[in-house]
């Protein structure tokens, strides 16, 4: 870290380091994130092409075959690389808080590949969690190749920021979200390289890829009379987020207790195919379904069915082992809940534009509680809607949702996963560092023992000060 009396030469070298790390990780992280997203879309598109013109049963069987193939692929990856478990955003957070521990980049790349297989096959999982962890692994790998005076957590944070920025096209939100959810601080030393990575990743996307923001919405003026409805939606979003997260953890614990991973994967694939035959919107990432909600193209009953189906499908897929993220499903659930709230608001006499506003607000409220980044999610809303009014409504609902979910569940889904593994980030980084140190490592064997005679001498021999006092005349 530079001091106030830093020489111009040292300052120049530090700036070069910051720019180098930020640009390299921004380019690599942006490329990796875009390739992942486009890869999922390309493979899923090939599967959907085979389903065109088929009967509902035939199309369902094609999707089931793809999911079964994905289940075998995931199981094969885990066995081939001897993975004890899949890694995800929780490991990226833990890696940033344990800079002295080696970051498991290899496991990160393998886990991202498994998530690619799962999402491409049509499992109800998210893509941004794997992309986030992929970015963190890229950052850690860059540090292994090009170490500098920057700390390891900054490399990880740069990779995450690049991935988020490329995925959403929201560099400001990426910087804040990383500082809020990954680093858990806003230190100046970290902001510069993270910002460079986020902006470079955003710039890389249009240069090399034909991609736009995954969600599209037309902002409209906000009726501030909706604020009580927004507060109520925030409370409902917290309850939905808690149900979602608890269901995921309990299903995963149940599946693990059975100790038959392949059977659980095949069961997840079969159940997902059945749900998809009944509610096609629940299949895969659900990006188009969310855009349909944002456009107001669903009926009340359809949105309610989509919410229930997506909740069940995601719990089945992730809980039973089809690896993937939780952010996209959280956005889907929040959009469905907000859409329902919008219909209620219209019934209470508000303008039809309330449906769009509350759909966006619901997305932010549920996602903010699940990933533990309320301000970052609000900024994502602001950047993809370009609406100050939408952002204000979102921050009100997100604050209410996060307030409730933090007290009734945990700071985020990832924090709860870490607590289950014995890592409580609320205790601080010092606590995590002490967990890595064994008391036995501090034991000193070369101790000189004190005999009984030496102890008597030490106890009975007067100190020089006592002898001096004994020679002093009494004042009496």
What are these regions (language model features)?
Residues 1-461, 467-469:
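Alpha-helical transmembrane segments and immediately membrane-proximal extracytoplasmic
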Residues 472-476:
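Hydrophobic alpha-helical segments, chiefly the membrane-spanning helices
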